[in-house]
């Protein structure tokens, strides 16, 4: 089992690192990325975007003010599970960007995440820096490589991650004039 997760405070660049890595990989990509958006009223919400079909408008949470975010369990338990199950069947590498606290009560979704982590698929993900039973369960797994992204290492950690993925036999794209080690 090949499971690599990044963790760091918000705004450190974890998702940006994953996007840079995806540009270098020569495999089919599944999974999801959560993006934060503001609607026309200025309200913040969180959208789960599938890497399989690029579809968005899968609202998993809405910021309610006072540092409270209301999870949308229906989206996790339906669209989220669909994204994960389709990815497990149809992709070589699965992105989980990000696993946080909103899905704590989404039992079907958490079960699908466990199935992916137990599979032979390569997983590249982000774990929110938060204390919760599900996040702690993932962190404590023996088959997890957990890398801490900092402002000091974020510019060179991408190459380290690419080397790990290469050692796991993930094919990379080669570019003209690129040296092959």
Task: Indicate where each model-derived feature is located.
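Hydrophobic anchor at the beta1->P-loop junction of P-loop NTPases
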Residues: 6
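The conserved Walker
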Residues: 10
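Conserved glycine(s) of the Walker
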Residues: 13
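Generic recognition of short, well-ordered alpha-helical segments
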Residues: 16, 43, 107-111
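Hydrophobic positions on the alpha1 helix immediately C-terminal to the Walker A/P-loop
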Residues: 17, 21
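N-terminal phosphate/diphosphate-binding loop that engages ATP/GTP or pyrophosphate donors
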Residues: 23-68
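Phosphate-binding/switch loop-helix module in NTP-utilizing enzymes
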Residues: 65-114
């Amino acid at each position: 089992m090949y499971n690599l997760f990044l963790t760091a405070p918000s705004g450190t660049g974890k998702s940006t690192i994953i996007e840079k890595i995806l540009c270098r990989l020569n495999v089919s990509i599944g999974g999801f990325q959560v993006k934060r958006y503001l609607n026309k009223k200025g309200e913040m919400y969180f959208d789960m975007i599938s890497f399989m079909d690029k579809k968005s408008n899968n609202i998993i949470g809405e910021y309610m003010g006072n540092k409270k975010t209301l999870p949308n369990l229906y989206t996790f338990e339906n669209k989220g599970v669909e994204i994960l199950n389709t990815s497990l069947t149809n992709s070589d590498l699965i992105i989980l960007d990000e696993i946080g606290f909103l899905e704590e009560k989404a039992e079907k979704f958490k079960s699908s995440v466990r199935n992916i982590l137990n599979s032979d698929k390569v997983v590249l993900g982000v774990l929110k820096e938060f204390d919760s039973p599900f996040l702690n369960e993932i962190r404590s797994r023996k088959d997890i490589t957990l890398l801490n992204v900092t402002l000091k290492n974020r510019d060179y950690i991408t190459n380290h991650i690419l080397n790990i993925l290469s050692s796991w036999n993930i094919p990379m794209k080669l570019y003209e004039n690129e040296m092959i080690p």
